[in-house]
Amino acid sequence: MNGQITDLDFFFNPKSIAIIGASDTFKFGYTMTNYLLNSNFKTYPVNINKDMIFGHKVFKNINDIQQDIELAIIVVRNEYVLQIVKDSVKKGVKGIIIETAGFAETGIEKFIKIQEEIEEIAKNSNVRIIGPNCVGITNFNNKFTTSEINFDQSIEGGTISIIAQSGVLGNIFVEWSTSQKIGFSKTITLGNKVDVDEIDMLEYLERDTSTNVITIYLEGVKRGPKLIETFRKLTKPVLILKNGRSEIGSRAIKSHTGSIAGDDKIYDTIFKQYSGIYRVNNFYEMFNIAQVFATQPLPKGKNIAIITSSGSLGILACDEIERLGLELAVLNETTIQEMKSFSPNWTSLKNPVDLGPSLFMTFNKSLSAILNDENVDALLHIFAVPQNPLETFSIPITPHLREMRNLSNKLKKPIITCVFGSRWVLEYFLKHSHKYKIPIMTQISHAIKAFKFMYDFSKSNKNLNKNLEI
């Protein structure tokens, strides 16, 4: 909210860092301290009770460091934070991340006042502050983090960024999404938002060339009119998970980050009013849809084709298509006749196309015929084959993934695969899906909603004909 410094790149690519409360014992801050001190980032540990940490000299105070410091990360007990913020401002840092919890969210007057004093410091200085009660920033492009991210397990080349008011939940988002082979560009956790808020970060990510899709976990907003103004200017798709729909949930928010949730109906109206802003129901849905935006071309129309190995699941997809106002594509007769030429006579070749057991013999040819049909704008692939035949016959999936990717690129039509069965079957796809950039999910409703949001975005004035592929 501090309007004096709007370029927040020092949070994501700091030239120099001080960790106040740096630790070499197993407590909060240990993992970050160990990682940053052994990274290429110029990092200085500060701890009044230590002389050496992981072989590095420790400073008693940030002002004992002779070199300039761009970013201060604070991980000390809450009663010490205010003085350390003052010390950091005196040092001339550009940014402060306060990871410590225990402020306004406690409801305790003493800690509410401390947070208010920190907020005043932010307003009256050129220092930008994230937090308190957060885990800060992760930049997957340069591998900078103030959290506990394991870059050895993360997916490289992602273009999805996360803004989360919750700290730990931000890490959980990354961990789950990584297991689904969904890659990220940046994650930002804001906590109690004494200064930097979701609006500041939306503006930053809008300018960020490595971010194509923005996701937000939101509890409450302090600057409503400014948020609306920002929504008008954004040109990238934004997926929002806003909690506090119920009265119980709204009350719980205040004790979590100290935010006021507000009337959920107002939020709902605002989200629906602006193109490119889409509300989701849970984080699984949010990141499943985000990966479709990040990896697939936008559809030119709303006609959806389905290839399935289960007729029943194909029918369920039809229900979702109608419910969301999309259309089941009517295949040209020439397309149907082409598929008849290589398909067993018992297959159902009208959309949804049910290939049944012939899936592995006829899939690629059927896929090509359907995607080349001018009546088809997008394709849902439903895979429902048990583990046993896949494992017994060592059936490869990569030729199908490769063909899906090649045709999607060539014809500029999005494809989503929904996998049904055991975790083994899902992993059978996931271990190859990132290479071919085919979104893999387990919920048909998420896939159809992704097509719906992408179709709406393609019609909006925010679609600048940008290719949103990773």
Regions found by a protein language model. Name each.
Residues 1-470:
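Catalytic-core regions of core metabolic enzymes
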